[in-house]
Amino acid sequence: MIQLEERDMPEIPGTILDRNETQELRLMVADLLGRRNPSFPGAQPISFERYHLNDTLMNKDYYVCEKSDGLRCLLFIINHPERGEGVFLITRENDYYYIPNIHFPLTNNEEKGKTYHHGTLLDGELVLETKNVPEPVLRFCIFDALAINGKDITKRHLPKRLGYITEQVMKPFDNFKRKNPEIVNAPDFPFKVSFKLMTSSYHADDVLSKMDQLFHESDGLIFTCAETPYVFGTDSTLLKWKPAHENTVDYKMEMIFKKFQDPDLDPRDPDSTYTDYDSKPELIKLRVWKGGADYEDFTKLSLENEDWEKLKNLRQPLQGRIVECRKKLSDPGFWEMLRFRNDKSNGNHISVVDKILHSIQDGVSEEELIEACPKIGKAWKKRIYEKSQGSRSSYSETGRSHPEPNREDEPASKRTKIDMEEPEPNGFGGSTTNHQNASKQNSGEFQDIPTYEDSDDE
């Protein structure tokens, strides 16, 4: 039976820009990142497969966070010489929205006047918090950065990128909130801003155990490699885990309706046949995207009579809509619909669909993931030990008996404080707690979470 899930999806609290303004900003972003292509630069994950559990997470350092069920956006901040500070949200469709009434200071000290970012590009998710809260709250959760104040940092590894967010975005913004509560608590302040909770991959079990404490919907986990740069477009090291039965595909829906012949008219008359749009379609094709405007028939949607009535009662256009579907357990040859994807103009590309199908067939269950966490942790600590031994050997050969530690090789728990004598940020500052947990974490828990606590009172 079709499941038209009623989900409270966030709405962007701003004004969409016209074509000329959008193109100007697209080119500005491309230039900032050293790209010729002005397309959406955000990284896209691939589906988690069994070899990622048995091989990838055992051999590489990864951080994990919950996968928010919201609206993926990039946040772009500039300081125009004539128009002043501009804050924009960029959707996956590469549309730009101007966000008014919000300020991101560049420094902690604005006593002598406001300071402004120019050329800061952050990756995140706009979520609507409706769980465990008295009233809905719109929040932008930052989880990565592409550029900070005109500096392209995509070549940096994840710990460095998160360090930049902590020192040059979250700390100044948090200080601004503390000093200006009347501004951030005003009705026209567009949304709250937070740094998404992350932890090392072997704590995935802890993240899963606290999913029900989140204030927003979440439908899985995201594993981000700590040893690789930020990748534009599909990133084969960025992993999206969902339980096998919750893996979904976005298709384009095409309905084939019955045609009837009017017995009172000549069959040769073109007006003698009509399409019955009121009755349930004979067939609903699910079409897969092959790029550009090219789609091909791929599979079929299961639809009961009561499901059709439910769709009709929506009184919305149905033909050609992008729909999120999952395989029907009772009939693997068909799929069932979960919801419309109004935020997407195309379905998943066929190459992505192939990977999702493989992930469904060879999926990793939540129990298997939890069971593997101690092994992942042991492998992580073994890598740290082997790297430290290698560092000692190399320093011994040069006659140094007390080598300086390589900060990039240390576990996250050893990099939670930034050495301010370094020329640029590295590691993570602030507390290891986060607003996303409905209850405060106990002392000693999640000691290696690379995140930052804002000053919200929730």
From Swiss-Prot:
GO terms for molecular function: ATP binding; GTP binding; mRNA guanylyltransferase activity; RNA polymerase II C-terminal domain binding. Residues 388-398, 431-445 have a biased composition (Polar residues). Coiled coil: none annotated. Residues 387-458 are annotated as: Disordered. Its EC number is 2.7.7.50. It is found in: Nucleus. Keywords: GTP-binding, mRNA capping, mRNA processing, Nucleotide-binding, Nucleotidyltransferase, Nucleus, Transferase. The active site is at K67 (n6-gmp-lysine intermediate). Heterodimer. The mRNA-capping enzyme is composed of two separate chains alpha and beta, respectively a mRNA guanylyltransferase and an mRNA 5'-triphosphate monophosphatase. This is mRNA-capping enzyme subunit alpha. It comes from Debaryomyces hansenii (strain ATCC 36239 / CBS 767 / BCRC 21394 / JCM 1990 / NBRC 0083 / IGC 2968).
